């Protein structure tokens, strides 16, 4: 005689496996942080506190003008959020070279991008 409890346990484990697999296949969020050595005082020091970000990279546009041109950086600091390799949001400094966006605003954008998958 079959035990229905075992069927239920196996089914629950299978559903849990599928759920974990779908979470791992979710979109990848990466951030590129652009600034310049002469503007370190206005750097964005809270990027490491953002959640659900796969990688964060830093580029000094004063030392890498090719990146400045490629990503069309007009002021520093600039934060660009990429989802699956495609730019989805950009936050730029104001005229005083200070980042206007807050950590909460950037995190909200990341959360919105991830939720758009569901």
Stretches with model-predicted labels:
Residues 61-68:
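N-terminal post-signal-peptidase region of extra-cytosolic proteins
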Residues 81-118:
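Non-catalytic, surface beta->alpha helical segment in thiol-disulfide oxidoreductase systems
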Residues 71-81:
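Structural micro-motif
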Residues 10-21:
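Bacterial N-terminal signal peptides
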Residues 1-12:
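Bacterial N-terminal signal peptides that target proteins for export
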Residues 40, 61, 99-103:
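Solvent-exposed, acidic/flexible segments
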Residues 24-57:
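Local sequence-structure signature of Cys/Sec-based thiol-disulfide redox active-site neighborhoods
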Residues 34-36, 61, 94:
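Active-site-proximal beta-strand/loop segments in catalytic clefts of secreted hydrolases
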């Amino acid at each position: 005689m079959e035990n229905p409890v075992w069927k239920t346990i196996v089914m629950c484990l299978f559903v849990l496996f599928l759920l974990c697999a779908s979470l791992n296949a979710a979109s990848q969020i990466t951030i590129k942080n652009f600034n310049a050595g002469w503007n370190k005082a206005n750097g964005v020091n809270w990027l490491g506190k953002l959640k659900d970000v796969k990688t964060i990279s830093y580029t000094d546009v004063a030392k890498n003008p090719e990146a400045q041109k490629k990503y069309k950086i007009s002021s520093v600091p600039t934060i660009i959020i990429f989802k699956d390799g495609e730019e989805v949001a950009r936050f730029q400094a104001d005229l005083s070279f200070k980042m206007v966006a807050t950590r909460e605003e950037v995190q909200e954008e990341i959360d919105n991008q991830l939720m758009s998958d569901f």
